[in-house]
Amino acid sequence: MVLPLLMAGTGALQLVAKWAIDRPRPNLAAWGFPSGHVLSLVVFFGLMTYLLASSTLARPRRWLGYAGCAATVLAVAFSRLYLEAHWVTDVAGGFTLGLAYLLLAICLVETLARRRAAASPQGSEAQVHLADDEGRGADVDSVVVAV
């Protein structure tokens, strides 16, 4: 449910920014700042990277996923410049605005998940016993977060 809401917000954010800034593209009459392609891809692949980081995949596979996400965003950003569809600042603005929006959304989702977990019976405090091989150890209070 997060992805559709996030991408719909990305489209709205890009339209508002283009309307507010009203800067034309290099060779076109349409608005150019920020680059909608870059903004959308930063949000989408940034979310994929965030989800990948919390996955149970082996580290080499996660790094392959990170590299694929980064390469896609960079390739599209370069293509926007190469095709003279945007100025460098349009692409940088799309990247910056997309990253800010993504970080805000991740913070919001994590905050809501923590609140929901704290309100549920499974989110109560639990005691964890940490012990070494010989049975020596200590009790540690921790909060169990169920997402």
What are these regions, as identified by a protein language model?
Residues 143-147:
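Gram-negative host-targeted secretion-system effectors, predominantly Type III and Type IV
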Residues 138-142:
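Short, intrinsically disordered C-terminal tails of secreted or membrane-associated proteins
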Residues 1-28, 48, 53-54, 67:
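Hydrophobic alpha-helical bundle signature of multipass membrane enzymes
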Residues 26-34, 38-135:
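Membrane-embedded catalytic cores of phosphoryl/pyrophosphoryl-handling enzymes
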